[in-house]
């Protein structure tokens, strides 16, 4: 799989830009702040319907414009597909696949499989659990796009349940009775347990498959500085390691029943996959709080490379993007990383200094300057 062409209209700093890319290595060179990352952010958005830099869509639209448009032509197994996304802040995005409008924007998920590593990924190691949950869910959707619907359904249930709990909490706090009716809470408990079990099962399966790839990728990048490991940490007690939906539903239902008083007291849902975490370790120690900057960087990179390797094992050849990675690595780690990714079906690398990129990865070269992209 590779992206043949990318076009942006009113996306970030670009009023209008187009670039024809090549299979294999593509290097985007330019000073910091000229818009290199905006280009790969757009591709990442097509792959995940999410930005790796901001939490909302509004910053993606160029100042003064009403909407942004991303178009990319993706070639997979000899066939080309045009994907178009229109981003309108405050409204549902619109999408097209080929010549046909998509019923929902998320219908484009799976059309472009892409793994992106960026400096922000240091938060996978040092940041809050939400960063690691997002990492798992994005990879889960890349492997099996149907999980986009599972995640959306679960998040909708949590929002509805939180609204009910919040209303009841405020009613009790003010001494009133209006809005304090929790008669429908059991219904939302059932929905949360069912949808949560589906999402939890997917994550557990994913982590089991991903773990050996993380260990190998970290060893390949960091070369003997210790063994990396991952483990899923659910917010509910599971009697035995299981991905059986019925068992997980029962465990979530029991946890919801046991925690109901605390949830009513706090006015929010305290149980479910949205409270889970992915534990990262280096040797016997948790990476968060103990890993050095270099170790944290290498571990974050290993998480992305592990996802990339897992997709390839699944028979998917994703596009791999490395945003400003090589400047953070010493010569040895640069060379080892180049060996790991040199055979990617398509590799996009951004850099401020071209000499930071190992020679074996210097394929098609593009210069980014002044809102324009030119083939060098």
UniProtKB/Swiss-Prot annotation:
Transmembrane segments: none annotated. It is found in: Cytoplasm. Pfam families: SMC_N. ATP binds at residues 30-37. GO terms for biological process: DNA replication; DNA synthesis involved in DNA repair; double-strand break repair; SOS response. PROSITE patterns: RECF_1, RECF_2. Coiled coil: none annotated. Its main location: cytoplasm. Keywords: ATP-binding, Cytoplasm, DNA damage, DNA repair, DNA replication, DNA-binding, Nucleotide-binding, SOS response. InterPro entries: DNA-binding_RecF, DNA-binding_RecF_CS, P-loop_NTPase, RecF/RecN/SMC_N, RecF_2. One of its GO terms (cellular component) is cytoplasm. Gene3D superfamilies: P-loop containing nucleotide triphosphate hydrolases, RecF/RecN/SMC, N-terminal domain. GO terms for molecular function: ATP binding; single-stranded DNA binding. The RecF protein is involved in DNA metabolism; it is required for DNA replication and normal SOS inducibility. RecF binds preferentially to single-stranded, linear DNA. It also seems to bind ATP. Belongs to the RecF family. This is DNA replication and repair protein RecF. It comes from Salinispora arenicola (strain CNS-205).
